From Swiss-Prot:
GO molecular function, one term: protein-exporting ATPase activity
Pfam families: P-loop_SecA, SEC-C, SecA_DEAD, SecA_PP_bind, SecA_SW
Name of the gene: secA
Native species: Borreliella burgdorferi (strain ATCC 35210 / DSM 4680 / CIP 102532 / B31) (Borrelia burgdorferi)
NCBIfam families associated with the record: PRK12904.1 (NF009538), secA (TIGR00963)
Top-level taxon of origin: Bacteria
Keyword Cell membrane among UniProt keywords: yes
Cofactor: binding comment: May bind 1 zinc ion per subunit.
Protein name: Protein translocase subunit SecA
Keywords for this protein: ATP-binding, Cell inner membrane, Cell membrane, Cytoplasm, Membrane, Metal-binding, Nucleotide-binding, Protein transport, Translocase, Translocation, Transport, Zinc
Family: Belongs to the SecA family.
């Protein structure tokens, strides 16, 4: 209430920001006459002047008005488009580190030019992030003539580029790149074994296009670089055949809920559709064990080390059958099971679900089951973009998520007014009792509109629903196009003609499509279709000019019919995604219309709407197929979406709390790697680490005594070198430490003299980095296990995140110690042959291919190159099952054989 009163009296934060930009806008408009008088060759000279001013201590704010004026005039000259005042305001907001909400067709791409140009003048680089390669390449090519005139370089990073080309592109003043490629390049850079192989420079300023898609929709999507691991792929085939033998617990037919008392659960497992979780009952675990034994899959107890993984395999198999459906979450294509993006409807080529879920789906679908992967490096988009000194973003829909943007990223949303008033009519939702009634009504409405000639865009949430509607349209004789993950190769053509007269298009989610639907069709696409692509730019422009009269005739005819009619076949979980679909109509002041059709069988209503709605709607007569609008129903629909949005926000916030623990540890590890990469005296670093560790072992002991723990650890580190130590009777701990340091130094000096200082430093660097990477990979797996463990502690009234932070810190402290000790042990015990002269500072270029994590992560396979160092053993190889040489009593494979 107070917020509403304040906004009425002093305006919202967004409106106050807009008002603050007006004086600057007026000054930019006044300077326009100055820019009009400049010759083309003067623009790069003016750019150099602005750069010199910054080097002399001037600020970006003091040169802002001139920079914006120059870039506006450059756009007018090269693109024949003069940015409107609202686009200049949007550019100002982007420079200030805000998120701008601009409606579809209002020119977000051009609005980013001014902010990108201004911030590029510092020389620290600007990154413009897009959601796919097509948009990155399109936008960079589109804006390149503007930046060329201004004298600033522009580059683009695409998924098929090698690291050398990437490095060159990132070195440009302004670089276009997708969020995925940027994240992977950051992870890859921090797995390099040579500083010169790094492609990125310091994160300075970035502009994120479709920022809501990247920082909200994909916030739960960890980027993962992984390597192959030995997995029991046959197990997924074995348990897949057992799914039908297990039974879901019964639900209350009235509420649709399971009994609250555990003893009342009568089945083997429960299903949580909202959280996509399967939980076994005690009875279910007993039945699973009996099944596994009776089918000869295991022998003995299911709870032994060798058998307990079958609980995980079975859980994933049930998920695959009950929660992940073909043509909804994935399709089966030529390359096997392919994930479909929930928000865009596109196939996520090469990505795989993690934790064995993808293998379970492959077993379900009868395709080849691939090996699992282990995580080598990971980061979320939340923490990737928080590393930039300044970030801003743009989208057509951000205001509904303003609270989350502010709380998580400290970013404010500025709603930029349209250049022309919005003429689209947004109709009230039409609500039906069943999905069948709803689809019949949509078909009737589309048929009527199609006969009139008005173009229609029908949005669906899955491939399955798009194919149902397509079949119904075909039966009614409605000529139409279908845009979904199965035919995404025709996307450009389908979207180009979606605004033409009589066009009917069924699209599976329009979020992130990045292409405007123009009334009357797309003139450029129409011309390309007529004259082909092998023509000069001048010929193409002439053909466009000749076609314009016909195009304007079609445009005006479609406009008179009411513009594009958008029909939503159901409500999405997020109001923002619904708004994105609506926003395809009514661009730049064009007329348009939108309406959503909803049924009680839609996932949103079924999972999140109130329990009494179905009986109420039956009483209102809807069971007969009649639609209804009612304030209670509308309110329930809005509340259902808000509940989902709030729940998803809490999930993302919770994820960030866990991820912050990993982030701090990853930052420390990567800082250590960088320090080692730059270090020209790693031998000294290793000796310092050894002295610190020996001192740690001696803490609390008397100087005259040496503990057995100390001796055992010394034995494990120095091994055969202790022969030169002689008797240690009657030697103090401090004297022993000094002698050990002498032995270590002599050992390393001898190796350094053998192959040379630079070569030896490279060898030590390689061993240190290899150890860090290997141990950190194990640590990430341990953190995953810890997270699963602390989740269960909530049942004991313990705070899982507190437990995770405390234990995570403890195992990280052990990791740091283990890295140092295992590196010291290895470099001391290895002998370098005098023929090792071919060893060079080891480079580890990685050939990676993007793969996906369960809720949506991306996994990359890593191919490790072998080192050229020749290693000669000083003693016979120890068998994996023999006692470890350190005296711990463990088998070698479970002790020092791990490293």
């Amino acid at each position: 209430m107070l917020k509403a009163v304040l906004e009425t009296t002093i305006g919202s934060k967004s409106k106050r920001d807009l008002k603050d930009y007006l004086p600057t806008l007026r000054n930019i408009n006044k300077l326009e006459r100055w820019a009009l008088l400049l010759a083309d060759e003067d623009f790069s000279k003016e750019t150099e002047k602005l750069k010199d001013e910054l080097k002399s201590g001037n600020s970006l704010e003091n040169i802002l008005e001139r920079a914006f004026t120059l870039s506006r005039e450059a756009a007018r000259r090269r693109l024949k488009e003069r940015p409107y005042d609202v686009q200049i305001i949007a550019g100002l907001a982007l420079h200030k580190g805000k998120i701008i909400e601009m409606k579809t067709g209002e020119g977000k791409t051009l609005s980013s030019v001014q902010a990108a140009y201004l911030n590029s003048l510092t020389g620290d680089g600007v990154i413009i992030v897009t959601v796919n390669d097509y948009l990155a390449e399109r936008d960079s090519n589109w804006m390149k003539p503007v930046f060329d005139l201004l004298g600033v370089s522009v580059g683009v990073v695409l998924s098929n580029m090698d690291y050398e080309l990437r490095k060159a592109q990132y070195a440009k003043d302004i670089t276009y790149v997708t969020n995925n490629e940027l994240g992977f390049d950051y992870l890859r850079d921090n797995m390099r074994y040579d500083l010169n192989e790094k492609s990125l420079r310091k994160f300075n300023y970035c502009i994120i296009d479709e920022i809501d898609s990247i920082l909200i929709d994909e916030a739960r999507t960890p980027l993962i670089i992984s390597g192959p691991t030995e997995g029991n792929t046959n197990a997924y085939l074995e348990v897949n055949s057992l799914v039908s033998f297990l039974k879901e617990c019964s639900k209350d037919p009235k509420t649709g809920d399971y009994p609250l008392e555990i003893d009342d659960l009568d089945g083997d497992y429960t299903v949580d559709e909202k959280a996509k979780r399967i939980s076994f009952t005690a009875k279910g675990l007993n039945n699973l064990e009996q099944l596994l034994v009776s089918k000869g899959i295991i022998s003995g107890s299911m709870y032994t080390d060798s058998n307990f993984n079958y609980v995980h395999y079975m859980t994933q198999a049930l998920k695959a059958h009950l929660l992940f459906l073909k043509n909804r979450e994935y399709i089966v294509g030529d390359s096997g099971v392919e994930i479909v993006d929930e928000f865009t409807g596109r196939v996520l080529t090469g990505r795989r679900y993690s934790d064995g879920l993808h293998q379970a789906i492959e077993a379900k679908e009868g395709v080849r089951v691939a090996n699992e992967n282990k995580t080598m490096a990971t980061i979320t988009f939340q923490n990737l973009f928080r590393m930039f000194d300044k970030i801003s973003g743009m989208t057509g829909t951000a205001d509904t998520e303003a609270k989350e943007f502010h709380k998580i990223y400290n970013l404010d949303v500025v709603v930029v007014p349209t250049n022309r008033l919005l003429a689209r009519i947004d109709e009230d939702d039409t609500i039906y009792y069943t999905e069948e009634f709803k689809f019949n009504a949509i078909t009737d409405e589309v048929y009527k509109t199609y006969k009139k000639g008005q173009p229609v865009l029908v949005g669906t949430v899955s491939i399955e629903k798009s194919e149902i509607l397509s079949a119904m349209f075909k039966n009614r004789g409605i000529k139409h196009e279908v845009l979904n993950a199965k035919n995404h190769s025709r996307e450009a053509f389908i979207i180009a003609e979606a605004g033409a007269k009589h066009a009917v298009t069924i699209a599976t989610n329009m979020a992130g499509r990045g292409t405007d639907i123009k009334l009357g069709g797309n003139i450029e696409h129409r011309v390309r279709k007529k004259i082909g692509t092998n023509v000069s730019l001048e010929e193409f422009q002439e053909a466009v000019k000749n076609e314009r009269e016909n195009y304007l005739k079609d445009y005006n005819e479609v406009k008179s019919l009411g513009g594009l009619y958008v029909i939503g076949s159901e409500r999405h979980e997020s109001r923002r995604i619904d708004n994105q679909l609506r926003g395809r109509s009514g661009r730049q002041g064009d007329p348009g219309r939108s309406r959503f059709y909803v049924s009680l069988e839609d996932d949103l209503m079924r999972l999140f709407a109130g329990d009494n709605l179905r009986s109420l709607m039956g009483k209102l007569g809807m069971a007969t197929g009649e639609p209804i609008t009612h304030s209670l129903l509308t309110k329930s629909l809005i509340n259902a979406q808000k509940r989902v949005e709030d729940r998803n926000f809490e999930i993302r916030k919770h994820l960030l709390e866990y991820d912050d623990v990993i982030t701090k540890q990853r930052d420390f590890i990567y800082a250590q790697r960088n320090s080692i990469l730059e270090d020209t005296a790693i031998k000294d670093r290793i000796l310092v680490a050894l002295e610190e560790y020996l001192s740690f072992l001696l803490e609390g002991t008397k100087s005259s005594t040496v503990s057995n723990v100390f001796l055992n650890e010394v034995n494990s580190i120095f091994a055969y070198m202790l022969e030169s130590l002689g008797s240690i009777e009657n030697i103090s701990s401090l004297d022993l430490k000094a002698k050990l340091m002498q032995i270590a130094k002599a050992n390393l000096d001898e190796k350094e003299n053998l192959i040379g200082r630079d070569l030896f430093n490279g060898f030590l660097r390689y061993e240190y980095l290899k150890n860090i990477d290997f141990k950190f990979q194990e640590h990430l797996a341990n953190l995953d296990s810890l997270r699963e463990a602390v989740y269960l502690r909530s049942y004991a009234n313990k705070n899982p995140i507190t437990e995770y932070k405390e234990e995570g810190f403890s195992i990280f402290s052990e990791l740091i110690k283990d890295i140092k000790v295992s590196t010291i042990r290895r470099v001391l015990q290895l002998k370098l042959d005098s023929n090792s002269s071919d060893f060079k500072s080891t480079k580890k270029s990685r050939n990676v291919k993007p793969i996906h994590k369960e809720l949506s992560g991306i996994v990359i396979n890593e191919n490790k190159s072998a080192s050229n160092v020749q290693v000669v053993r000083s003693s016979p190889k120890i068998g994996r099952n023999e006692p470890c040489y350190c005296g711990s009593g463990k088998k070698y494979k479970n002790c020092h054989g791990k490293s």
